[in-house]
Amino acid sequence: MATNKFFKSLLFTLTIAISLFGLSIENSSAYPVFAQQGYSNPRAANGKLACANCHLNQKAIEIEAPQAVLPNSVFEVTVKVPYDTTRQQVGANGKKADLNVGGIVILPKGFKLAAKNQIPAEVKAKNKGVFISPYSTEFDNILIVGPIAGKTHQELIFPVVSPDPEKDSDVKYLTYPLYAGGNRGRGQVYPTGEKSNINSFGAVQAGQISEITTSEKGESNITIINSDGVKTSQIIPAGLTLTVKQGDSVKVDQSLNIDPNVGGFGQEETEIVLQNPLRIIGYLGFCFCVLLTQVLLIIKKKQFEKVQAAELNF
């Protein structure tokens, strides 16, 4: 257990370090790796992925994977995270920034991230600057990536190696489910439960806005006086566009700013078959027998036609 926690902490630190050194990380971030800190298993019993707890908007993704694979073979699982690259969102510092993307793939037990020497050169070129890692030592079949620049990585490619049932008795030749998730942009909730600045902030009480001031950091301080003369102040983070002005009357929970969220999270699932090579050989043998039978029938038919023609001539 202690080793697992140490691995998580080390992996988290390494990912953040890579982010700081600029391997395709930009100002506005989406961190799938944060899920490691709060969830031992990122997939809940109802099928919901942990990423959806922070990224509240739903956005579509696509998953591409082979229908069937052979044991001990390397293949690709591609998660497509499409979005309008011309759009920007509010960064943590309140400034406009491009969106980043992140992704997660939950493979069947026994399937793992392919080793560097197993990954084709073409995939290495596509994944240059991309750090893909297992979720934990316990769940090495779960792979995560991000944040990476969305403009250049709307397709997340996960190189995977399949297990060999001949070497692992826990693995069988079966059809397995495969789950994937992808997000673009920052989340609306931090892992601590606090709201980020990618939110619509509502009025804490009904009343009239008596004053709006702006701090040096760009934050808006809105003062609301209710009918009893009670004043409340609330701060709207920097970078958000207000929808109210001084003198306006507001209701409880009425939005005070335009919703800045342009991102979102989506998840999909598919199936993959771990195919027994003997079944393929058997199928090919069956096809050969059928083909041979058809050829022999045609030859026999030709011979019969010749015999009939000879008898008629006689």
UniProtKB/Swiss-Prot annotation:
Gene3D superfamilies: 2.40.50.100, Cytochrome f large domain, Single helix bin. Binds 1 heme group covalently. Keywords: Chloroplast, Electron transport, Heme, Iron, Membrane, Metal-binding, Photosynthesis, Plastid, Signal, Thylakoid, Transmembrane, Transmembrane helix, Transport. InterPro entries: Cyt-f_TM (IPR024058), Cyt_f (IPR002325), Cyt_f_lg_dom (IPR024094), Cyt_f_lg_dom_sf (IPR036826), Rudment_hybrid_motif (IPR011054). It is a single-pass membrane protein. GO terms for molecular function: electron transfer activity; heme binding; iron ion binding. It comes from the Eukaryota. It is found in: Plastid, Chloroplast thylakoid membrane. The keyword Acetylation does not apply. Residues 1-30 form the signal peptide. Heme binds at residues 31, 51, 54-55. The chain crosses the membrane at residues 280-299. GO terms for cellular component: chloroplast thylakoid membrane. Component of the cytochrome b6-f complex, which mediates electron transfer between photosystem II (PSII) and photosystem I (PSI), cyclic electron flow around PSI, and state transitions. HAMAP family: Cytb6_f_cytF. The 4 large subunits of the cytochrome b6-f complex are cytochrome b6, subunit IV (17 kDa polypeptide, petD), cytochrome f and the Rieske protein, while the 4 small subunits are PetG, PetL, PetM and PetN. The complex functions as a dimer. Belongs to the cytochrome f family. This is Cytochrome f. It comes from Trieres chinensis. The lineage of its organism: Eukaryota, Sar, Stramenopiles, Ochrophyta, Bacillariophyta. The gene is petA.
